[in-house]
Structure formats: C-alpha cells, structure tokens
C-alpha cells in the first residue's frame, strides 16, 4: 500500500504567512501604543528626548498609521482570497511584505528600548523590502483594475511613502542620541536639507510612477513638519514651498501607460 503525500501549494503558504504577519504586526503596534513599557509611548518618548530635533513632524501626522494599517488589512484579506492565489503581481511580491512587517515589529522594540541607532537598521529593514515590492508591482507604471489599485497598490504606496519620511526622521533622532554635532551646521539647516532631499526623492518617484497615494503621504508629512516648527520660519517656509511644488508636480506628472495587468 502506497502512502501518498499531498504537496502544499507554496502560493497558499505565502498567502497565509502574509496575512498572519500583517495581523501580528498590527497587534504588536497596538499593544506598544496602549501598553508601552514604562507607560511611555513612542510619541511621548520622542517629545521628551528630542525637543531640539527640527525634522520631527507634528504629532497628528502619526495618525497616518491608521490608513496604513487599514490598507495592510485590506491587502492581507484581498491577497488571501483563493481567486488571488496565483495572481502574477502578488507572486512577484513574494515575502517582501512579510520582511517589512517583521522589521516593523523589531523597530518598535528597539525604539521603545531607546536603542535608536539600531532602530535605524530596523527601519532600513522596512524600507528596502518595500522599495523592491513597489518596483515589482510596477505601481503607477501600468493601468490596473480599480480593485487591484485599491487593495494592492495603494496600501503599499501609503506604507512606503511614510517610511520614506520616517527613516529620515529616525536617522536624525539616532544622530541626536549619540550627541552628533552636525559638523557645525545648525539643526534648522539640517531640517531644510532633509526636506529638500525628501522632496527631490518624491519628485523622482512621481515622474516615474505618477503615484498620487505616495505623493499625498509626503505632502502630509511636509505640512506636519512645517506646522510643528512655526517658530522657525526657515523650516516652515521650506516645508510649505516643497509641499506646494509637489502638489503642482502631481498635476503635470505623466500618466501611466500600457495595458491593464
């Protein structure tokens, strides 16, 4: 009598793993916000330890995590459907989102543990997989169905947009934590440099991908930076000009071409 073994579909494993990792990362983030170590959440910790870091956005900006996690839940549920098991776009994405979510959990622990330089490494662990995933999904480069746009592309665009800003802020906090002198350049000037670099990166992404979701997240962050630092006109004006420029750029950016995928 022969024993037969049924091969598990690797795409099914991927679907389950992605959904489980998304749920796990949201649970960990929620616990860290409502029951943080020592009763100090991330926003409060940043305010207490980094009052002089002038690239920090206003606290309301962190509400962006609500649509980020809502989008990830939508992504997780959508990709887990049997009809999406062999979706070429999702197959190309592989386990990249899993790596990003795991790194997100690591970042939360490291930041709350005040291991700020190591938290930058974890943030890179979020950013790099998201960049590769963004490229593999070819977001904004081809027309796709509205369903795929809302449940696959937009969640990744919003997540990547915020992490693009967050890693700049995180790096600034890490440097401050080790008493980096800034090479004699004032914090306000460094903030302006960071804003300009962020706007330049966003310009390149917008020209190549014409991705309104990514663009709006950056604009949201720039406005929040300007509002937090109203007492420093140089930062506020630079952030406002950068935001206006990106808004105008979004109007003239090239539209995606190609067949539906």
Where are these regions (language model features)?
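Membrane-interface helix caps and helix-loop-helix hairpins in membrane proteins
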Residues: 106-120, 178-185, 204-209, 229-234
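Alpha-helical transmembrane segments of multi-pass integral membrane proteins
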Residues: 20-28, 96-108, 123-135, 152-170
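Internal transmembrane alpha-helix with an interfacial aromatic "cap," most often the third helix
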Residues: 73-91, 98-120, 124-146
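Central hydrophobic cores of alpha-helical transmembrane segments
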Residues: 213-224
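Alpha-helical transmembrane segments of multi-pass membrane proteins
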Residues: 22-40
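Membrane-interface capping segments at transmembrane-helix boundaries
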Residues: 10, 81-82, 135-142, 250-261
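Short aromatic-rich membrane-water interface segments that cap or initiate transmembrane helices
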Residues: 48-64, 149-157, 180-191, 229
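N-terminal membrane topogenic signal
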Residues: 6-19, 65
